[in-house]
Amino acid sequence: MTLYKRTDESCFKDIKNFDYMCHFISNIVDISDKYSDFRIAYVDENTKGKSGTIVCIHGHPTWSYLWRHLIPIAIKADFRVIALDLPGFGRSDKPLKEEFFEFNNYRKILLKFIDKLKLENIFLFLHEWGGTLGLTLPMENARVFSGLVCFSAYMGNNITSVSQSYLNWISTNIESDELKDL
């Protein structure tokens, strides 16, 4: 039984203005041992940066490429910059089973990512769904976080439901023939 799909690297050969080395981390999905080889892709630039570590978490339907204009500016300010591809996006593996698509699973993946890379002095840069996820991270280990920038994010609070228009937008992204094969 196939649990996920891996996008061939040739799909990214014509990407412009994104000449950063791609790294992969695995063994950070807790829902089943069957996902032990599931890979999360990320770029990690200026690893010796002295100003802190910017961790960029994108939203729908984009990937780490979203941060291509921010990365050189942050490097110039001597930040280490990590831009990851959430599961299902960019160079990360694409889950195929519904069991994977739980908020708490994505959240745990992000926490393990931070832990495995031993990140500290983190400044989160959060976009859309990345903001919804990322805003829950500092409460787990506040000492490693130094700040955050959040834009175009849905702030879930368990009191109000997600709007139907937002759900329709997400559904359109998931069901779009143009996005299915990415």
Regions found by a protein language model. Name each.
Residues 2-24, 40-48, 53, 60, ...:
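Flexible "cap/lid" subdomain of the alpha/beta-hydrolase fold that forms the substrate-access gate
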Residues 65-82:
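Short amphipathic alpha-helix adjacent to the substrate-entry channel of hydrolases
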Residues 23-33:
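Short acidic-hydrophobic surface loop/beta-edge motif
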